[in-house]
């Protein structure tokens, strides 16, 4: 697989209309199954085709059980300078339900160990809306996160995706989905407590200490180009969306034999506008109305002004420096607001 990654990098070296990169992210599964020297080899491979900024953010997603002492010691000798650790919960019963291999104690100890090895830019994932996760347990989870003195939190509601263990258990009546009000209260507590502990809520699901906004995720939300390598990886060049074959063997075979290993979707004028809505309104920078007018003209500028009026009146949106920004109340209904702002072409 590594040779295929190298081959795809070579094949797609001209995809990005830029000569340097500010962020590299090893994610999309469990990249920590690769040895640190293999991770570094891929970073070096990237440097053949692009200049990597001296202050580039280079992130490795990892499960707690992969980050043992030997792995961390070797990883410190690589260019990786940020860890994103999939903790999910510190309660063992939740971790068993989510089919995780680590325990709550192992997760906590892993973060402490990574800090001991000098990693000072660490993000952790937390899941709320989990069946059986009471508010008391959720508060305990977050208290442990704050106690760890990490720099970044990503937190998501449990999703019942089709054909997953969760969705099958739900269908069989083996799980009871959390009430919407309980999920709302857990999310609200997260927002309030994160602020009290020095975090900025800079995107719907993301919180950071000063100076630790994720460069990588921010690239998506700020409509920057990105290139994804490997099975299921997505790419975007401001004109097209592109996604690779999901099946490992089919991907490897196509890359090795010079076949097609991705699909493309051309974005029309309104697709690009709706993308801007989706990525901008979810952030604390908000939707820049000046940018809307510059890139999409007066009609869509007026469309945004008109849509915003009722949400400004209801205090779900505030207008600052010609940008539309969701309030805390707006964040709770963000999907509805963004859908309302979308421009749908009439047949």
Name each model feature, range by range.
Residues 298-312:
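Short amphipathic alpha-helical interaction segments
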Residues 222, 313, 328:
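Short, ordered coil/turn segments that flank beta-strands lining enzyme active or ligand-binding pockets
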Residues 323-327:
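Minor-groove-contacting beta-hairpin "wing" of winged helix-turn-helix DNA-binding domains
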Residues 329-347:
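Short, amphipathic alpha-helical interaction segments positioned at domain boundaries
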């Amino acid at each position: 697989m590594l040779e295929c990654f190298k081959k795809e990098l070579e094949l797609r070296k001209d995809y990005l209309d830029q000569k340097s990169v500010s962020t590299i992210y090893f994610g999309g599964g469990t990249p920590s199954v690769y040895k640190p020297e293999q991770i570094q080899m891929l970073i070096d491979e990237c440097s053949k085709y692009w200049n990597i900024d001296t202050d580039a953010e280079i992130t490795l997603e990892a499960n707690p059980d992969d980050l043992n002492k030997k792995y961390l010691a070797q990883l410190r000798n690589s260019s990786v300078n940020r860890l994103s650790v999939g903790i999910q919960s510190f309660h063992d019963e939740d971790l068993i339900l989510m089919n995780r291999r680590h325990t709550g104690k192992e997760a906590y100890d892993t973060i402490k160990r990574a800090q001991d090895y000098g990693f000072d830019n660490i993000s952790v994932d937390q899941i709320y809306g989990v069946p059986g996760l009471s508010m008391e347990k959720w508060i305990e989870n977050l208290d442990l996160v704050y106690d760890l003195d990490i720099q970044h939190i990503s937190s998501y509601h449990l999703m019942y995706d089709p054909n997953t263990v969760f969705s099958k258990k739900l269908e069989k009546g083996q799980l009871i989905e959390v009430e919407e009000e309980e999920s709302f209260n857990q999310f609200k507590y997260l927002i309030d407590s994160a602020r009290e502990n020095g975090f900025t809520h800079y995107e719907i699901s993301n919180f950071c200490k000063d100076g630790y906004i994720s460069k990588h995720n921010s690239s998506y939300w700020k409509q920057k180009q990105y290139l994804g390598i490997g099975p299921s990886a997505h790419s975007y060049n401001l004109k097209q969306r592109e996604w690779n074959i999901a099946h490992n063997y089919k991907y490897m075979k196509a890359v090795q034999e010079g076949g097609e290993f991705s699909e493309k979707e051309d974005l029309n004028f309104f697709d690009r506008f709706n993308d801007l809505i989706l990525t901008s309104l979810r952030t604390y920078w908000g939707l820049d109305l000046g940018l809307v007018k510059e890139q999409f003209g007066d009609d869509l500028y007026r469309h945004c002004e008109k849509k915003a009026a009722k949400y400004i009146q209801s205090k779900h949106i505030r207008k600052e420096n010609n940008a539309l920004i969701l309030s805390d109340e707006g964040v709770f209904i963000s999907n509805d607001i963004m859908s309302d702002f979308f421009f749908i072409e009439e047949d």
